[in-house]
């Protein structure tokens, strides 16, 4: 008998609400016969915040934690000051649920036009650290609003936090083309950069089949444009990973095809899967948003739960859909139906 | 009678030594009749360090300071641990000489092939803060080399430091298309980001003709690929500026055409002009390196000293050279001669 998994669903705002149902449908269809899903919906995001001021109430966070995984749509609204929802909801979940691997595949699908003239065969994964670095909210300001104001941001990096994500990257490389590229800025951020490099060298010795090299973040942004097919697994910190994955999304034809997983690889807390795109208030409510990235995030969820064959069904359907119909204008529902029909 | 300017020349390492003489020749030719130059050469960089361990001796730094401007080639050698020369020489000069504006124009020249399929008309300038942020070397580590290691990097940002570079950007925008885009990550780096935004808003009020908007660094890396012609003046901090200008260099066909100025806009200390590319040990000594970026850095030096017409001569010659011969393989000396012949 198929086991039932409990999934917390946070559709969020804008197009998040429109694409998430398609992620759920794809999940069910792909796992038919091998897994069942029971959903718990959470009304979190900008609309909730504007309505009653709540961002992530403690009891709701506890209930989220009791699930096997989380599906998130998108969160955000231009009416809310930058940082409030990001730090109070999205990053809070990543940190509290210790989702230390932020996994972001970039693939140029056949049928998608890259902005690059000669993109080559792009298929790499960014393994972004998710719980440290400049994202930990350390920092402050004195004499705010005066000419003497000083504002700081502190990047905190621990050997504990770095080593576990480095191990994840090498393990992942073993299943791929066996190459890891560490990206940092160790010629300037010498403390953190040196520690990352030492840990990569050490863990690398345990994986003699995996080659690894190093690039400064500035050089990496060049190669993502000039030679993106050189990459297999890119391993980097929280901020550099944020930057590189958006650039990568652009290079593979837009973040509309990019999903991501915020993974607690020790399974202590549920992992979270989301499209990389935002809530896109400009096209919200018009049945226009492309649900492909959300559907791909369902595939990542399935892989995380161990259902590789089910995930493969989604990938195959998405690839065929994009190749055949990627350039036609379709509604959210039409794309969702087309992909499901192929599964 | 033409005034004589004293120029400190730091050819540095690798191809730095090959391209810098062409920057000097272009400088002289362009300023013929309006300015003369007297050079003081400094033997600094990797080769000097490997020879006698000196990076930037105090007396040499004092002599550098006594010049009107600095021409730098490139510094670096793979035999030296990352950070030593960067922090001991390049960044030390930027900081000690208070070069708070790191000015980096990006232009797609006619005759250069961009890696983008539809690059459009790319012509923007990045105004990167040069003396603060994550570059100040604040940070450290405890329990180094143990599983309990913690490494920090601290970004220090002051209203004083931010306001002066913001003013520079708005003034520059008045001479261009009157648009400033602030790039930061204010939804995560809330202390520094909020201060940058407030200061931009405040200074912006003094320039009612200049419009300004904001982009997160991750979004900016997308637009540099998907729609780079939208930018006019990009204003950003030290680290984000480092990243964006390399990506921009790639988008305009390679850092070989990109020059930069580290500018002390209060003229208290000399400003420094350099090509964006590195010392390229792989092609050093082969008369292969393209001197165009170095020659363009001479044009920036001339503009800084107020010789706009002379600078224009260089720009016109470089543009014509690239349009006609940009795709032919030429030696360093041939490119140098060709450009000079047009001036
Ligand atoms: C919304 C923001 C906090 C977030 C981040 O910076 O991580 C986003 O850009 C992302 O990449 O998921
Ligand atoms: C060499 C390095 C310290 C430097 C920087 O990060 O500023 C370089 O990348 C640059 O952009 O000039």
Swiss-Prot record, chains A, B:
Q: Where in the cell is it found?
A: Cytoplasm
- What is the required cofactor set for this protein? Mg(2+); Mn(2+)
* Principal location listed in the UniProt entry: cytoplasm
Cellular component, GO annotation:
cytoplasm
For this entry, list what GO says about its biological process.
Answer: L-leucine biosynthetic process
The record, for SUPFAM superfamilies, names: Isocitrate/Isopropylmalate dehydrogenase-like
In this chain, substrate is annotated as bound at 94, 104, 128, 218
Identify this protein by name: 3-isopropylmalate dehydrogenase
Tell me which species this is from.
Bifidobacterium longum (strain NCC 2705)
């Amino acid at each position: 008998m198929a086991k039932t998994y409990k999934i917390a669903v946070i559709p969020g705002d804008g197009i998040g609400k429109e694409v998430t149902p398609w992620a759920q449908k794809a999940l069910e269809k792909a796992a038919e016969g091998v897994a069942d899903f029971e959903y718990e919906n959470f009304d979190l995001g900008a609309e909730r915040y504007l309505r009653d001021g709540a961002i992530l109430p403690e009891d709701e966070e506890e209930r989220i934690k009791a699930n096997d995984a989380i599906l998130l749509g998108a969160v955000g609204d231009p009416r809310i000051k930058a940082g409030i929802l990001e730090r109070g909801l999205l990053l809070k979940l990543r940190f509290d649920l210790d989702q230390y691997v932020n996994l972001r595949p970039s693939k140029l699908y056949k049928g998608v036009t890259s902005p690059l003239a000669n993109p080559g065969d792009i298929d790499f994964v960014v393994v972004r650290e998710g719980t440290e670095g400049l994202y930990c909210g350390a920092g402050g300001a004195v004499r705010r609003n005066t000419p003497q104001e000083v504002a700081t941001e502190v990047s905190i990096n621990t050997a504990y936090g770095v080593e576990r994500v480095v191990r994840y990257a090498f393990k992942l490389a073993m299943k791929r083309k066996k190459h890891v590229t560490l990206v940092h800025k160790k010629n300037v951020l010498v403390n953190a950069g040196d520690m990352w490099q030492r840990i990569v060298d050490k863990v690398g010795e345990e994986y003699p089949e995996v080659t690894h090299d190093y690039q400064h973040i500035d050089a990496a942004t060049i190669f993502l444009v000039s030679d993106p097919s050189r990459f297999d697994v890119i391993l980097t910190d929280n901020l550099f990973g944020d930057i590189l994955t958006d650039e990568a999304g652009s290079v593979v034809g837009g973040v509309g095809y990019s999903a991501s997983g915020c993974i607690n690889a020790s399974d202590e807390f549920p992992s979270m899967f989301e499209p990389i795109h935002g809530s896109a208030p400009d096209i919200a409510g018009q049945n226009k948003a492309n649900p492909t990235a959300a559907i791909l995030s369902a595939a990542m969820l399935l892989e995380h739960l161990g259902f590789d064959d089910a995930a493969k069904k989604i990938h195959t359907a998405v690839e065929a859909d994009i190749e055949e119909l990627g350039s036609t204008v379709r509604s959210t529902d039409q794309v969702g139906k087309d992909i499901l029909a192929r599964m």
